[in-house]
Amino acid sequence: MDPLGAPSQFVDVDTLPSWGNSCEDQLNASEIAAETYQEETIRSPFLYNKDINGKVVLWKGDVALLNCTAIVNTSNESLTDKNPVSESIFMLAGPDLKEDLQKLRGCRTGEAKLTKGFNLAARFIIHTVGPKYKSRYRTAAESSLYSCYRNVLQLAKEQSMSSVGFCVINSAKRGYPLEDATHIALRTVRRFLEIHGETLEKVVFAVSELEEATYQKLLPLYFPRSLKEESRSLPCLPADIGNAEGEPVVPERQIRISEKPGAPEDNQEEEDEGLGVDLSFIGSHAFARMEGDIDKQRRLILQGQLSEAALQKQHQRNYNRWLCQARSEDLSDIASLKALYQTGVDNCGRTVMVVVGRNIPVTLIDMDKALLYFIHVMDHIAVKEYVLVYFHTLTSEYNHLDSDFLKKLYDVVDVKYKRNLKAVYFVHPTFRSKVSTWFFTTFSVSGLKDKIHHVDSLHQLFSAISPEQIDFPPFVLEYDARENGPYYTSYLPSPDL
């Protein structure tokens, strides 16, 4: 809170000049008359609209300082990104914001999630995750960035918000070209205001000094402040201006349907003349060959009539898709948790893999990415026999993997994972975890039931795995020594855990 009598650091959006008021070359009556003919013959798809321009504000400043209904925070999937926008928001909002984020279970790319503003002037914070940009996946990145802006605006509409302060969602860390991203941001907001303009009074683009020039350059294309500016901006519009809502359009993916499929066309004779071309190649391509009825295959699976070999082949194809994605995805944020790692071998010479439950913030990470990381690490391990050591030590409700995720993991992984897994050592279980494990292995994945071994102390674990063969997190050793007494004083924990 500001000291008594001191000026507030927050900025009321109603005091900021709108984009429409910043025009320096307003047209007089004679100029409008001179352009009437041009106006009637060719107009921009983004028409001059004084009312819409009055709702838009370009402001150079920190979005966290805006006094409006909601501001936008750009982050990563776990909502823990360290970028200037997020750090400023977290600093001003106070510690309660971090506690509130624990309940959100992260946020997928393109999604938008809502929290309170706490100590901010803004009543709410809308969190979203911009895409990582790679030129070969440009279309996917464009669609994801569009979804960010669209979902933020949709959430604002659903919550009856009167004003929203946007930061630049495409952070430099994610590599999205600023100008390309600005086109998507501006046209998405423009189209939303055209359709749902009555719900929002102000949309503020809060930009840095580096970003301001790009926004100044592109705003006239989507929010022309006069007929003259509209006309002048028309040649500068990109070829792809999206659909009626600003969403990127990929022509090759559009389904083309004849207006009157059953009616003869007026130029049928001209079309008939073109039928002399060689059509013999049609159907020769792989994609044009007849395949089995997919729906029929699914029915057969449900009825248990599809062969075991066909089921295995289908499962292998699915696993290979996950594996390809795991090898191409940036999983550094999951790796940094140090929740899964390879250590030594057990007394039978089998590879030991360690899972640290306390290092898995289930509510803050993208669990699909966690599954991808598991596949990325385990694919080459599972080709031979291995064992898993799971430390349940000092876990909280935010660390517990739900049964749906575990069942999905079990169903997705290749058969070699199940065949070569010889034991799962569940270290420091609680009564609740024992009951949950029994239900899960009895009713969901019965193939695991005989491989689960509950281990109450590390001393019991050492009968199967020598202590020198495991890298222990320090808190596991401290907890076990406190609960079960010291037993192996010469062992030192790994400094990396």
Curated annotation (Swiss-Prot):
Gene3D superfamilies: CRAL-TRIO lipid binding domain (3.40.525.10), Leucine Aminopeptidase, subunit E, domain 1 (3.40.220.10)
Protein name: Ganglioside-induced differentiation-associated protein 2
Residues in CRAL-TRIO domain copies: 333-481
Gene: GDAP2
Compositional bias ranges of the Basic and acidic residues kind: 253-263
Matching PROSITE patterns: MACRO
Domain Macro: 43-223
Residues with the Phosphoserine modification: 280
